[in-house]
UniProtKB/Swiss-Prot annotation:
Catalytic machinery residues: K66 (proton acceptor)
Matches recorded under Pfam families: SDH_C, Shikimate_DH, Shikimate_dh_N
Name of the molecule in the record: Shikimate dehydrogenase (NADP(+))
Organism whose genome encodes this protein: Hyphomonas neptunium (strain ATCC 15444)
Catalysed reactions, as listed in the record: shikimate + NADP(+) = 3-dehydroshikimate + NADPH + H(+)
Gene encoding the protein: aroE
EC number: 1.1.1.25
Amino acid sequence: MTHLLGVVGDPVAHSLSPFIHNGWLRAHQIDAVYSAFEVKAGELVSGLQSLSSQGVIGLNVTLPHKEEAMRLATSVSGTAHRLGAVNFLVRREDGWIGDNTDAPGFGLTLDFGDIEVSGRNVFLLGAGGSARAVASVLADRGARLTICNRTVGRAEDLARDLAPGARVRSLDEGLRKLSSAALVVNTLSLGHSGGRLELPPSAGGIFYDISYGKGAEAALKEAREKGWRALDGLGMLVAQAAISFEHWFGIKPDMAEAHARCRKLVEATS
């Protein structure tokens, strides 16, 4: 019997997840298909019921459903509780089991790129859902973390919840101090709305944007021109997919191969 898996969100047609997972499924000769399912905001209850009746056994969850997925799951992991969101579901007889791959995916990305953060100055730009996962990993790994956000109160809430030792700055103040950073992680969505970051020069620091493709182009270009080592979020996407794949099938897929496949596709379509 062919297993059915997928990603739910809105919009979701642009997702690279089917491309990643179906490549791994073919490589391991697994009888399964991974698809993208568009489910509108507020329709996750009926969406999950429909997908369950179709025989879907596992899902990745993207915007705008991560918080609602946590409320709907029969049980959720400690990581998901800590981050306040679910982005991974497995169907069991008694309902959907929820987890969150954002934090372990970011951690795996740091490992994959040999990026050491312990005791180093790290600046996190943004305080939204993705920033919560990033902050938790950076704090757990002993980074000297500064969280920068336009709304300082949100950054303070994030620090209190997940990174008690972090410093908090307004975005403008933080941007002026970035030169001292060994790593900057940008979770802001400026590139998707035509906005632009004004980065200071760097002598070899790393600028990591969790976006990829056109959404990250402007920030990465600015970073390279200012002397930063610029990295996009494609690696984090692949890492999260690998964690999901291993959960479902007990197999560690080839991340490097998938990353190369995705890079080629993104460059061809940018």
